């Protein structure tokens, strides 16, 4: 039980580090896609290592979410877990599709990974919105902050699914996602596993 809490909270903190690294790496790479794939391969130790580390962090987060879903029989955590499972599919696509592959294959893997990641995050964030809508763990003001952040970011990813925003626009909401992950970490630390949230 404590392991699930540790996994959820620790991964929610660590993922902020990998998001920061990703934004930094994105700023260093070429803007033209073909040149970017070449740049990624030339610096594969950095990119591959980053994605492997993030993959492990996301696995930790997923384990925590699945445990909470089973422990509480919670719809919120079931939605969150489903989103995490979809997100996990992104990493094998990048790790297997980018390294030393022709541009056409790398581009296909990139489109698949991006689409999977966007849909996974949409489901994950909607699950968080549902969780914080009913949760009584936080004080009212923090609950409203969590609801606002999860609502805005969910809507942003929905706009990406529809096509009104692009994946490149996601950098704009990155600070909001960072803050939401920190709130998630606090939730994992504060919640008592003996409590049952049948209404979630």
Whereabouts are the PLM-identified features?
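Hydrophobic, aromatic-enriched alpha-helical segments typical of multi-pass transmembrane helices
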Residues: 1-200
